[in-house]
């Protein structure tokens, strides 16, 4: 069984999280510039078995795709072209992940300076996306 990899995609940078090979625990992996995302993922997948990629889907409070989709959709198209044909890429609701990441850091006692680290928040948001997906029936397919 291979790992799951989650991406919290942003215009400037992307938070990335992965599971362990048994898909029990999700951990933060890295924050990479958006322009280097595909290279990073290809390199990681050359070293580790990844069976599925989960990408945060930014939605509005009403559940509609947000304006951010206008830059995420082309990036996903480029990513899919670089992956093997039919490789599973799942879009997953990411509402409130940045807020939840900030709250988790606060609860963990991270000082204010650490909570203002946008890269750390992006990584934590990717972990939250991945944990949400792992908790869903869809991830068990």
Regions found by a protein language model. Name each.
Residues 2-7, 11-12, 17-141:
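Phosphate- and other anionic-substrate recognition elements at nucleic-acid/protein interfaces
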């Amino acid at each position: 069984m291979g790992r799951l990899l989650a991406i919290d995609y942003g215009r400037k940078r992307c938070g990335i999280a992965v599971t362990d090979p048994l898909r029990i625990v999700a951990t933060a992996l890295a924050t990479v510039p958006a322009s280097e995302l595909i290279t990073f993922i290809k390199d990681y997948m050359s070293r580790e078995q990844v069976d599925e990629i989960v990408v945060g889907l930014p939605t509005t409070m009403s559940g509609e795709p947000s304006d951010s989709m206008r830059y995420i959709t082309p990036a996903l198209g480029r990513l899919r072209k670089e992956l093997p044909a039919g490789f599973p890429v799942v879009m997953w609701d990411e509402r409130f992940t940045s807020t939840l990441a900030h709250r988790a850091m606060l609860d963990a006692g991270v000082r204010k300076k650490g909570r203002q680290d946008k890269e750390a928040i992006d990584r934590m948001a990717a972990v939250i996306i991945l944990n949400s997906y792992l908790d869903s029936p869809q991830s068990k397919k």
